[in-house]
Amino acid sequence: GRFQFVDSNTGVRQNLTPNAGVGTPQYDGSGGCTRSDDYHCFGTADRYNFAGQNLLLTPSERKGVFAQFRYYFNDDVQWYVKALGNRRESTNQAAPEPIFLGPDAGTGNPLADNIVISALNPFNPFGFDLDSATNLIQIGRRPVEGGPRRYEQQVDTQYFGTGLVGTFEGAGRTWFWDVKGMYSKNKAEQTNYGSYNLYNIYNINLALGDPAACAAVAGCVPLDIFSGAGSITPEMLRWIQPVVRDRSQNELSLFTANLSSELFQLPGGAVSFAGGYEYRKYEGAYQPDPLTVARRYNGLPSLPTSGSYDVNEAYLELNIPIFA
């Protein structure tokens, strides 16, 4: 962890991290980087190496089925049906998600930026409140105890289309026509493991506050972000680490009709004609997890959204060969 604050007792600005291997670090309030307590000045060597947690090959599994049916009523008219179903299951992984607290953390989430950590927190080694309004600058703690961030996706795609295709004779020429309808849907769900519920971290009366207030709330466990790796227990993680699910879907409905033929001959060739109509309707929706909507999730906040629009299109084409 990294702790940047102004000591309320001495007025000294600190930028510290616990020494390696220290279970319960002791703080003596001394300034500078020559220290007699269990901390040292934060430096480049203390930064986290992401490489070990990233995946070179992203797991992905696809399952699909496709079916097609075609029926000839006669030589001039045929009917077809196409259907498709596909499922993708994939996983992304990133380094353990950091917890950033304080005004310089820059999370954009007031639950993190405006935090107050009580001196009564049993794991607070500094002996005074850490208050974003007065002396707290920034706290950064990467809870390696919670494991890497994992994003599991399940994406289902369905497609169904049917139509008629044919020809007919009229006005001394052959006409080609087709009509079809189609519906497709793409539905996705992403489940995020390894993130943090900032509401429980923020509340001074709960995980980082007075232990008596925390004890009065079912499931609350005082949180230790002040010690080194291993200080956050499974019980603490269960209180602050939710499973976040975001869902989205897109739908497309389509109808189209087309007609074409050759109209007459010129020295350069046949003048041909094509015309048609197409209707499309697009629908989409995104439903983030309630924790995300409530701005209690450590990631970027977002709101549910949905919408749709229709498109009506018609076209007319002529192909006129000018030169032979």
Language-model segments: residues:
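Surface-exposed, low-complexity loop segments enriched in small/polar and acidic residues
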Residues: 2-62, 66, 72-311
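Structured alpha-helical segments in the cores of large, soluble enzyme domains
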Residues: 310-323
